[in-house]
């Protein structure tokens, strides 16, 4: 399995399985001298951890992170940062029947076909449990980006099933169990999820992410465009089936006179491009959206096969999120932070001495 590392100059490698002893991450390329504690990382992990809502998995994990290396006397040393989280609430017996069957719309079948073997307990490496380490690594990137560059990254639940959250403007409050900035919609979501649980079903969701104060110039054309790397990182999140940058798929219905982000001496007139042009950040807000599929781990019977290829009826038991999108916001924020951090490091390495010859249109007052 060779796809466990993200980034080039700021590299993150994760390891571990859902029901293994622990999850871990190695961060290579973090600049030295930044103050970093386990508490700094724990703040982000607590936003993601399971068991915080009746509409999320009932699995209880403290997700207490340990810093194993790369920090001395409270500051990063520039050496690899090792992070570890122990699993404490595995219930592998819930998955005993999954060993010889394939859950529909899960990675069970494809992992078996690719590797000839799989850890069936909780999905093993394919479980969203692994994203705890992405959030932990993202916390390090977030801290650096905010303290050194003033970059803020914040996401929110913009759709859950038929319920949409519209007209959200910065700053917004996402400090609730749904990461929803609209208090009225929070109650609507709560009622919808209660009914969904009674129906033994699940639902999809959409998450929106905004990154503010991103400097102009991040992105490496042509193959490592900033939007390409953001899409790659966000698509690697479990259950994500679509990524949009800026207006995304809505551009198919737009005309050029509407979509083009005109420029004046006072700055950009609009931001349909989502803060990226030609694969390079413009200095405007970077805006991205992800669509997450409904989990197929539900109590409603569905057709599948066993390892002998025989037809079976499958009911997935265990502790699962009826909407995986509810806890996806901190994960999406982390992935955006990791990409921006990597591209900042790459841009600094090559273009650190470049003085932009034209005014900063995103901040014309400067």
Curated annotation (Swiss-Prot):
- Report a single Gene Ontology molecular function: chorismate synthase activity
Q: Which PROSITE patterns does this entry report, sorted A to Z?
A: CHORISMATE_SYNTHASE_1, CHORISMATE_SYNTHASE_2
GO-annotated biological processes = amino acid biosynthetic process; aromatic amino acid family biosynthetic process; chorismate biosynthetic process
Coiled-coil regions listed: none
**What's its EC?**
4.2.3.5
Matches recorded under Gene3D superfamilies: Chorismate synthase AroC (3.60.150.10)
Q: Which residues bind FMN?
A: 125-127, 238-239, 278, 293-297, 319
CC terms in the record's Gene Ontology section: cytosol
Annotated residues that bind NADP(+) are located at: 48
NCBIfam families hit by this protein = aroC, PRK05382.1
Q: Which family does it belong to?
A: Belongs to the chorismate synthase family.
PANTHER family attached here? CHORISMATE SYNTHASE (PTHR21085:SF0)
What the protein does comes down to: This reaction introduces a second double bond into the aromatic ring system.
This chain belongs to which protein, by name? Chorismate synthase
